[in-house]
Amino acid sequence: MEYGVGKMTEGYLTELSRSKRVASVEQLVDDFWDRYYGRIKPWYQPESDDVILTASFDLTVGEACRRLGVRNLVASEVDVGTMKVTYLNFSTNKAKRFRELYGPDVVIDEFYTDSKFDQPMIDMARHAFMVKGNTITQVK
């Protein structure tokens, strides 16, 4: 599955980067966040030790993190030069990569998600919350 998702994404990004309607992928990302940054929920107030853990690509979410002042991002990765997907951060990969980067004994105080597929991360957290729209429900 990872191979298929990676190849599909690579093909899409390669075509997008060659499009005459797009100045650059980076500009497309900037334009996207100029338009949608305001949709980040107001309840989220970044802290210095926050980690954004997502299956989305560093290419896109990295810009949101920069604007939010969040320095810690664990995301799927794309080599911008080749548009090849180098890492997919989903399912059990999230917990594995998180532990690789932050250590096996790091404590997660609070974990927020919109997906039950994040159960491995929920299990690692002291407190966990499911987010749906503007509703936040504690699940652990």
Feature locations, PLM:
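C-terminal cap/substrate-recognition subdomain and adjoining C-terminal extension
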Residues: L28-K140
